[in-house]
Design a protein with these regions (language model features):
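Proline/Glycine/Serine-rich low-complexity intrinsically disordered segments
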Residues: 1-125
């Protein structure tokens, strides 16, 4: 696990006493996994995909297990930063996202880029 992350907080609360190794960044985490010094890692799926799994050194590794996304630790999702007072733009963005989600197009587009669902579920679905 990366030190001082929400994943460390989750482990401390949910799996107290678990034998974990803490890292000061993601690169050493991926190196130890690749070289067999750890059996698994837990990190942000987007980061894992972009920095490791989609690269040559990430070949042979994959997402496993259930999605860990308790709101208490990980919030309600990602967001888009806007300047205060951009209410019209916020409304347009929310409307567009709602349309894409309801039609299934967001998931279709995301599947072209990421090997995991953007919404709750098991990896690889």
């Amino acid at each position: 696990l990366e030190r001082a992350t929400t994943y460390q907080s989750w482990f401390d609360d949910i799996l107290p006493g678990a034998d974990i190794v803490l890292y000061d960044g993601s690169e050493p985490l991926y190196l130890d996994l690749q070289n067999g010094r750890v059996d698994l890692i837990m990190t942000n799926p987007m980061k894992a995909h972009l920095k490791f799994l989609s690269k040559e050194n990430g070949a042979g590794f994959e997402f496993k297990g259930p999605v860990v996304d308790e709101e208490k630790y990980f919030g309600i999702g990602v967001g888009i930063g806007l300047r205060q007072g951009e209410d019209e733009l916020k409304g347009r963005l929310n409307g567009a996202l709602k349309t894409l989600i309801n039609s299934g197009e967001l998931e279709t587009y995301a599947r072209k880029i990421f090997p995991f669902k953007l919404h709750k579920g098991e990896w690889g679905q």
